[in-house]
Amino acid sequence: MKNILKKIGICLLTILLLLVAFITYHMQSHPVVTIEEVISANEAAQIQMVTKKVESVVEVLKTSYAARFAHAKAHACVKAYLDVNQDIDPQLRYGVFEKPGAHYQSWIRFSNSSSNMANADDRAKDARGMAIKLLNVGENLNSGTTQEFIAHNAPAFFVASVDDFNQFLASKGDLKYFAQGYNPFKWRLRELWQLVTAFAPPPKSPLWTQYFSNTAYKLGPHNIKFMMQSCESPKNIVAAKTDDPDFLKNTLIEELAASEACMQLLVQKQDANKKMPIEDVTILWKESDSPFLPVAKITILKQQFDSPEQQQFCENLSFSPWNALKAHRPIGALNRARKWAYEASANYRHRLNKTQVPQSLDW
């Protein structure tokens, strides 16, 4: 009997060790890190597929109103200032951060990530987004005059390439996408983990969430990612009633009616000697390898933002990572796909809704 129990114990230990090795393989395996972008031979065709699928999703999910392909539900569009830190590291002084103390008007949009407005409940597990649009920065890559930083609440994304994104869209969110075939070493466990991490229970408030760029950008000669977070740790934050499907919006209404809010923008420089790839955005750039460095303060004004006119203005706004100065150019395959996907989503929904992007953004 003892021998049988011993053999069972050895088998269980072996299975456990194999399981640990298997998970470690998926979570720790990394591609070669480069400081340059890598463009695959079929990238243009893959991007064209993404664009068509974006339009298809907008069409299929439209109700009486065609919403965005992603981050369809806005909690608010609010007025804010961005001020470049006076003591910003000289190595980071490029683009809108070139001049210490530079001051910009901006709009910030807070959102849920779901594409489906028919089921847009703040209480549901979902990713959350923050996008800031700086005004009057000079001519950007899309011939506009804004600089936009778009982020969501998870530090890494759940697809590694444009091809993978197309496969995920084709699967319609079926979890079998992450475990295709009989070879477990070809499964996408790291990607599944990133998806589960992003789709978290709702925060108490959009103001007390960390928002990450996921994808990489230029900052002058550097490759960077960025993050936005509150200037201080949460203190006595009371959420609106969570039996309310719009409680995140209502929490913001209460907070910004009482006082202004402070957030900070930080950047993380790529170290090519570390596991910090540009192209595979499922891989976390570890802060132990390269810490986030503060570059600017964001002051969200005390305000009322829930008038029907401002909500419609918010719906008509369009954001894109490519509304950027050359010094902040988006890099990597997924960013290159986003250029066309965001444009397709905006053009398609504006055409269906018979609306236009607001021409005047100043306030």
Where are these predicted regions, by residue range?
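N-terminal Sec-pathway targeting helices
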Residues: 1-17
